[in-house]
């Protein structure tokens, strides 16, 4: 009886399909000193083939726009995006979606208090391909000087 139960458990383990965790975006972080207490924080998204990530300026009513919140210091000006921006009208949402494929570099000026040696924050983003969209995801980051 024990052998039968053991065999059933092992069989179920190998037969039950394992859920595949999709993670089509990886982030790299860097910082460039621009002044005594002024830094340029770079959050670079590397996007897998056939996937795209939405712009920080993606319109309301569409997919989740990328948001980057900085916990340390004070942001100076608006976040900039460096990459090949694409715009497509999505009839499901009724808006022009703005997104990037392959890669995008989000750049934000941050003024830090004297002695602060790190920039931390959270990225909220959503990715889609031609068949599916993944739910919005939060990623915490820490950039050391």
Model-derived regions, located:
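Extracellular/lumen-exposed scaffold segments
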Residues: 20-145
